[in-house]
């Protein structure tokens, strides 16, 4: 579950001087998951091209980061950041994945309200004003809105010359991105073949639009990487 306590846990862990930070773990995990789900892709260190792009959406224009190998056609990956949005850490994660042979679009989920980065370097979710600001934007990511966004992002990817549209799309989500990968898989089931969430929150609820209810609409292979504190706060979710 991705809530204010979890985010504070994340910051404490990342600042604790461990040998492997959550950021580094996520970078390694993302590459590993995509490699397993698309096993025929080479595990080389591709030379990449990167650019800031504007994607036309139903509700406006989304500023995104697009990074891909400098030659050839490659499977597409749609990356949803955590609640602090598109920022240098996620640009680095997208680049790392692109170096493994993927065309990666890292999106600004809050484009309706602000261009990325939506918070400054070092902003803490434990700060009340920062938390209030981010949560207000996150609440606008309803199922209807986020599924429309997913369709637009994948339409953008499929229109790129360096995307292999004969290969399925992968999607990754971090923290609040957990529900977004499920909605992506449900919104474009014929294109999304792999989905993974890390520390995802709000995957299961009693609401009529709970993300887990979209599972029958998806044909993707899915991995949810759940931490111990996630399970402690929502022990029944795994049994749904």
Predicted regions and their residues:
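N-terminal secretory signal peptides
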Residues: 1-20
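The feature captures the conserved acid-bearing segment of alpha/beta-hydrolase catalytic domains
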Residues: 202-240
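N-terminal export leaders
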Residues: 20-35
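Short beta-strand element of the alpha/beta-hydrolase
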Residues: 74-82
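Gly/Ser-rich "nucleophile elbow"/oxyanion-hole loop immediately N-terminal to the catalytic nucleophile
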Residues: 123-170
């Amino acid at each position: 579950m991705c809530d204010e306590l979890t985010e504070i846990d994340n910051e404490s862990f990342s600042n604790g001087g461990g040998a492997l930070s959550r950021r580094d773990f996520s970078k390694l995990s993302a590459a590993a998951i995509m490699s397993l789900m698309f096993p025929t892709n080479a595990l080389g260190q591709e030379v990449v091209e990167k650019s800031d792009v504007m994607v036309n959406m139903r509700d406006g224009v989304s500023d995104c980061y697009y990074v891909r190998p400098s030659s050839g056609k490659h499977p597409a990956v749609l990356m949803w950041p955590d609640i602090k949005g598109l920022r240098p850490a996620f640009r680095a994660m997208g680049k790392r994945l692109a170096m493994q042979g993927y065309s990666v679009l890292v999106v600004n989920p809050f484009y309706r309200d602000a261009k990325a980065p939506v918070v400054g370097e070092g902003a803490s979710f434990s700060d009340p004003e920062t938390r209030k600001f981010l949560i207000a934007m996150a609440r606008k990511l309803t199922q209807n809105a986020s599924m429309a966004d997913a369709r637009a992002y994948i339409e953008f990817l499929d229109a790129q010359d360096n995307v292999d549209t004969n290969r399925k799309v992968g999607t990754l989500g971090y923290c609040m991105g957990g529900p977004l990968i499920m909605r992506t898989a449900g919104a474009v089931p014929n294109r999304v073949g792999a989905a993974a969430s890390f520390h995802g929150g709000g995957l299961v609820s009693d609401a009529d639009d709970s993300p887990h209810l979209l599972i029958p609409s998806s044909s993707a292979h899915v991995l949810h990487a759940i931490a111990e504190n996630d399970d402690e706060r929502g022990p029944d979710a795994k049994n749904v």
